[in-house]
Regions:
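Conserved residues at the C-terminal ends of beta-strands
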Residues: 54
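Membrane-proximal, glycine/serine-rich, low-complexity loop/turn segments characteristic
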Residues: 1-30, 36-41, 46, 58-311, ...
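Small-side-chain secondary-structure face that scaffolds active or pore-lining regions
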Residues: 183, 188-201, 223, 231-233, ...
Length: 393
């Protein structure tokens, strides 16, 4: 059983006709939170008391033309006339992949590629000696055999945790409810800046209901949320995982392979800003001057931030003394949200090794440098937006 703490994720498993984005395949549905049209992003299920779905004539009669494509009405929890109650819930769990694709290794790929060329009447591209070296595993840095689904790059599982505190109470004159929710989710990657990928979120919702006298009641609702999502620059890891040939490139090569007498090679790596763990340099080729591994290690990161504030208040007046069943309702609401992305965008150099063999030992006798290491230290801001909605009825 899945447990989520935002939006209406997986609600389609409980409500017929709801597909996660619309009602019965119809977009632009009207969403009401406590009677106010609102964006439901990041609303926590622990805040929700009831969800009602409407479609068709009854929706239009009640809410006008905006409801022609369906209505989702969310009612949040409220306080009751009880003693102070505090409820704290903590959840933690792990995302575990059921399976990962199992692609061919370099030797198998090269063998089948030669067969494909032979079927087209072409000569072999890879020699038997090359295939032997790539298949032997004797030097995976010279004879690359990259598996991007390997535990060298991604975790078997990653964590997601959240904690929620609900506080409520009151008497016949006033009662209140408060919900405080914090969540943190990590990511599957374990290399470079990507190992710091993750999401943090804080939601705080509160409301107060007042009974001023026998015929006048009032209420106040407020909600604030803060979300941030950090991610390494370079977003094409999974597409590369399914298309990058296993023999194309070794992303990291140990410095220990560089010949002690290769002075020019040592000068190049000595001036590099991106020696990984003090013992690996970023490898590249003329065709792959940058790659997804280099991006994750050296191109920086971005952080997306979302903030929102929601407030509404209303008064209900019973006018039974004037006419039985007559009442007056008024409400005012204001919603404000901002979003922006900050990032550090770096460029980096990669190095193509020139391999040789000395006494049966593979060594690097030279390096060819592509691109330059550049870290400006400038924080870039992009994707900024803000939205304000005011309602009075």
């Amino acid at each position: 059983k899945n447990y989520y703490t935002w939006s209406l994720t997986d609600m389609q498993g409980y409500v017929g006709g709801y597909n996660g984005n619309s009602l019965w395949g119809m977009d632009e549905k009207l969403i009401l939170v406590d009677g106010v049209p609102r964006n439901i992003d990041y609303i926590s299920p622990t805040e929700i008391s009831q969800i009602t779905f409407l479609k068709g004539a009854q929706a239009v009669v009640l809410y006008g033309s905006r409801a022609a494509k369906g209505v989702i009405m969310i009612t949040t929890k409220r306080g009751k006339s009880t003693d102070l109650q505090v409820d704290v819930r903590a959840n933690t769990g792990f995302y575990v992949a059921k399976s990962y694709p199992e692609y061919l290794g370099s030797a198998e790929y090269m063998t089948l590629y030669n067969e494909a060329r032979a079927n087209d009447g072409l000569g072999a591209l890879y020699s038997a000696e090359d295939i032997y070296h790539y298949g032997s595993g004797e030097n995976p840095y010279r004879y690359a055999n990259v598996n991007m689904y390997s535990s060298d790059y991604i975790k078997k599982a990653y964590n997601r945790s959240d904690v929620t505190a609900e506080i409520s109470g009151g008497n016949h004159r006033a009662h209140f409810y408060t919900n405080i929710n914090y969540l943190r989710s990590n990511d599957v990657f374990k290399i470079g800046e990507a190992k710091h990928n993750g999401t943090n979120g804080l939601n705080i919702r509160g409301n107060v209901d007042l009974t001023l006298n026998d015929f006048i009641t009032a209420y106040v609702n407020a909600k604030v949320s803060f979300y941030s999502r950090r991610s390494a620059n370079g977003s094409y890891y999974w597409s590369a995982a399914s298309t990058l040939r296993p023999n194309r490139i070794s992303p990291l090569i140990p410095l220990s392979y560089i010949d002690a007498n290769a002075a020019s090679a040592w000068d190049l790596v000595a001036n590099s800003n991106n020696i990984v763990d003090g013992k690996y340099f970023l490898a590249g080729t003329q065709s792959d001057m940058t790659n997804v591994f280099g991006d994750y290690y050296a191109s920086g990161y971005s952080k997306a931030t979302d903030r929102s504030f929601q407030f509404d208040a209303g008064v209900n007046i019973g006018l039974d003394k004037v006419l039985k069943g007559l009442s007056f309702h008024t409400r005012f609401s204001v919603d404000y949200s901002t979003a922006y992305i900050t990032s550090y965008n770096n460029s980096y150099a990669t190095y193509a090794p020139t391999w040789s063999n000395n006494g049966g030992k593979d060594i690097i006798v030279g390096l060819t440098k592509y691109n330059e290491d550049k870290k400006s230290g400038v924080q870039n801001i992009s994707g900024s937006s803000d939205n304000q909605t005011v309602l009075f009825s």
